[in-house]
Amino acid sequence: MSYAEKYEQQMKEFLQVCRRLSENMYVTSHGGNLAWRLEQDLILITPTKLNKGDIRREDLVFIDLNGKRIEGQREPTGETPMYLNFFGQRKDISSVIHCHPPFTNAFAVMQGENRLMRPTFPETTTEVGPVPVVPYGEPLTQKLADNFLPFLRKYNAFLMENHGLVIMSPEGIYRTLELIEILEVTSQSLVAALSCGEIKEISREDVQDLDNTMRTRNLPLFGAPGEIKSLVDLYFA
């Protein structure tokens, strides 16, 4: 049995997410890419040089953790080295999406304080977490992939400086899309608020309450397992 047959349902979901990203204008032209680890050494990934809204089942590619194409007719995305870093450094991660949602991307080019590192809305604080800016590296290069290394074990969402967003999740590809949508709505609200005045953050005490709620519900913290002890440490250390 081929991998395309074995993972037919996952490929359908993957394509649905590709189309949703395109419809939401989170990706345009050939921009953005997605990857989903289906087995320890098997990754489903988008091909290079295709609009995500136009990708079909036969365009998808299976690669291993060395970047070798295992199945599929097309070449994998040129950002494959970046994804290999992600999956190699974070054994807990199942899916990753890189895209360019416009309001979130505003913070990738904004000078001054990065407001996405601060707690402003409960849902974003507990589900997405802080979003650090990864220093600029030319797209499709090993340098860009390496620039993530100081951040990978502590966070699950990242802004590539002057480039775009990366979000990863220990769950499936659709959940990662949901996290992008949560963050983009938050970013839109922050951009609107900044045009009117100052941002009001969630207090340390209220973040502690959110942390207690996460523990009660057995929700995982961000970053590699065991790396972060509490939301308070993450936002206020």
Where are these regions (language model features)?
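Glycine-rich flexible loops
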Residues: 1-237
